[in-house]
Amino acid sequence: SGSAQQKKEYFNLNVTGIGYLSSIRRVNSGNGEFTCAVINALTGPTDNASYQRFDITVAGPENTKLINRCQKAVDEEEKVLIGFVLSGLKADVFTLQSGEHAGEARPSLKARLIKVDFIKKGQDMVYTAPNATQTPEPGSSAPKDYDPNSF
């Protein structure tokens, strides 16, 4: 009997958040066609949030379908807010192409979009994942439920 194929295990570093989707595009390469986009993730206090840009490559057929369905709304400059999980974070630098800061370099984080928790177009929730990661409402705090044998 042949030896069973060993399943490769990985250490995962994932980023979970919400942010605005923009610049959806399909890219053709030697590995086939895939979808890329930009997520400007919200970070900081809810009354004075700042943004962190992520240049993402969409992973998986279901996520690709969901992001491609947002193309029209994004092209028409509607606000598309998504709940997401990213993986495979890498630092990069990009150059601003337009505006008063055109030509200036800015930091960027590249990542793979591995899960879409929800999609909101304007004020309308248009998609919620069947097993969405529940994000507590801003300002709410769940009671702490400690294990009796906590460290």
Which sequence ranges carry the predicted segments?
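Single-stranded nucleic acid-binding surfaces, predominantly the OB-fold ssDNA-binding core
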Residues: 1-151
